[in-house]
Amino acid sequence: RKIMGKEVKKFGYSCKLDRVVDGDTCDALIDLGFNTFVKKRIRFYGVDTWESRTRDLEEKKKGLAAKAYVKDLLENSDDGKFSIISHGTGKYGRVLGELFVKGHEQSVNELLKENGHAYEYHGEKKKEFGG
């Protein structure tokens, strides 16, 4: 990532979960340091999960399972605390982040894919359900 023409490392932050929105999005209080906090919506970087708010009952079932998986990981991690590596903001203004919880070496993003709750996604046309 470049800032003022110079390559810099990605930024890492400590967070406190507010709520899980769906399988690939949560709201959190982000600690910016110097006793400064901001509440932001975090879109999980590099993954997409099936929709939990849809009329397609099979897709909804998979979407709700992904949401429950994320909720369990984040709520049971150090009283809702987790860390993120920020990848900037997405097209809808959400923070794009890789989430990390205590007790897991892999990111929540990777765990979602590994456990069949998500697929790789970097802004391209979304997959149809079942695809």
Feature annotation, model-predicted:
Residues R1-G131:
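Small beta-barrel nucleic-acid-binding modules, primarily SNase/OB-fold domains
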